[in-house]
């Protein structure tokens, strides 16, 4: 893919479980390092609507035909609202890269099995977890509709100031800023997930 192709990074906002029913889903479109657009929707805490919201958000955007790929900051959003990469790819035709700062621990899978009966099946659709070395450390990732080597090159091309590719990093900052009031606040409490979450 071209160095200056547009990608959309997607992450969720802050929430407190049992207090909030919904949180923001933010899509940040970048042309390499330049922010080119911002999209948003609301998703349900521990719900099942993140995939349809991602599809709706992108498909109804003027940026749709310019976007060359989707970078999800984790596969779980708003708690246990798990992205169905197969469904997203089928509807949008865009390759998907799921990035994580670290591989998930066993507690993540146990929680999914307990609270989301079809969750493991959705996660398995994204395939194995790979890792690629960036100037800022290893980025762990899954892919759908794209090969792992091409995805690795994209991650490294977009890892400008951290090991998280710029579209996903910017989406995370915007989501945190608009829902918590401060994009610099670390994950804590109800908005953190026990695994590769956004």
Swiss-Prot record:
InterPro entries: Endo_dU. Residues 179-198 are annotated as: Disordered. Coiled coil: none annotated. It comes from the Archaea. Belongs to the UPF0215 family. PANTHER family: UPF0215 PROTEIN MJ1150. HAMAP family: UPF0215. This is UPF0215 protein NEQ431. It comes from Nanoarchaeum equitans (strain Kin4-M). The lineage of its organism: Archaea, Nanobdellota, Candidatus Nanoarchaeia, Nanoarchaeales, Nanoarchaeaceae.
